[in-house]
Every structure is written in C-alpha cells, then in structure tokens.
Amino acid sequence: MPEAPKVPEIPDWQKPPRNVSLRIHAGENLNTTPNNEPHALIVKIYKLRQNSNFQQLPYDVFLNTQKEKEMLATDLIEVKEVTLIPGQKFQFEEKVTREAYFIGVVGLYRAPALNRWRLSFAAENVEKTGITIGAHGCALTVGAGQVIETANFNPKFLNETRCQ
C-alpha cells in the first residue's frame, strides 16, 4: 500500500498571528528625579524580525524616532508607545505576526540604570505566558516571560540597581 503523502508545513507568514498578553505595572516611584519625585514614563514596544541589532543600539538611538527606524532598518516591523503614570497598571493583548520573532521593550527613563532600560523576548516563548514588566525609578524588571540576553543581572530583581 502506498504511503500517504506528507502534509507540507505551513510557512510562518501564512500562520495566524500570535496573541501575546502584555502587562506593564508602573511603580509609585516611576522615572524618579534626584529628589525622588516620580514622573510619567514612555515605554516603547517593538515587533522585530531579529533582535541582535536592537540589543546593541545605545540608549540615545531610541530617543529619536527617525534614527531608531534607520538603525533598526528591516528588523523593525512595528513600534508602539505607551505613556505610563506612577502607579498605573496597563494591560493589553498584542497581535504579533509570525514574521515578528522578537518583542522588544524600552523604557525611556530620565536617567536609566545601566543595562536595565531594555528587554527582549522571543515571541514564540511568551505566547503562552505573556509578558509582565515592572517599571520603576530607573529600571525595568520582569515578572513573567523569558528574557533574552541580560548582561550580568537578574531581570526579576532590582537589587544592585543604582539610579544615576
């Protein structure tokens, strides 16, 4: 009896988008000044084809929308901005196309802590768990979602984080 033909695998671009739950909890001490006065914080959410470029760009690139688009080039699929106020909890379902393999998050802090203002996640890994991020005085933390590439710190905790 002849073997049944194998069903071809569906290419990523034909699969339905992923639904990723994104939660950002802003602390009461959000984006603080040297006098510990809290301020609003802009958080940018990126849908990316690749994340290596995103991980290497310096902070100031993300402050300039045009420069950011030029530097991320073809890696960038979409970027959204959310403005948070101290104590706010923000939650939404994000549709992530299959061509976006990564989700990046940047907190545009007044004085960001070294290496604590940017996070990236593999979209496939956070489809089930979602992403929960804490936004604090000068740093981001992660409550849910597996982070890619953290440089010598545990993204779940603020210990040893120094605001400038």
Predicted regions, residues:
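A generic structural micro-feature
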Residues: Q14, N35-E37
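Glycine-rich, aromatic-bearing surface loops/beta-hairpins
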Residues: R118-Q164
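Short amphipathic, basic-aromatic surface patches that mediate peripheral association
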Residues: L22-P34
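Gly-Asp-aromatic-enriched flexible segments
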Residues: S21-L22, L114-A122
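Mid-length scaffold segments of soluble, non-membrane domains
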Residues: P38, I45-N115
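Bacterial Sec signal peptide processing site at the extreme N-terminus
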Residues: M1-Q14
